[in-house]
């Protein structure tokens, strides 16, 4: 079975990928993949995504060193969403946090729930 061809991509050829920390199940991020990024991910053993804003393939950690080593890949019953278990090196979030889900709403107030690991300006040259 060639699962890459059996998956259901949207009209832009993309499929969402939920990325969890291996061992804890903590959601680190949600990103988009296409067939090319999925093939590269499986070949490399590290996460490779499709950037909708830049319209290009990007290897997670290629600039920052904050790679995501794949431990497991699953897909849902409709074959239209992927779930990856990864070992995260450094911050998953481009804002410098371990998880992109570093904010919570508590009693109507937004709270930052974890420490920033890196300064994004130093890592990516952005504010």
What do the PLM-derived regions correspond to, one by one?
Residues 2-14, 20-23, 27-28, 33-127:
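C-terminal binding/interaction regions
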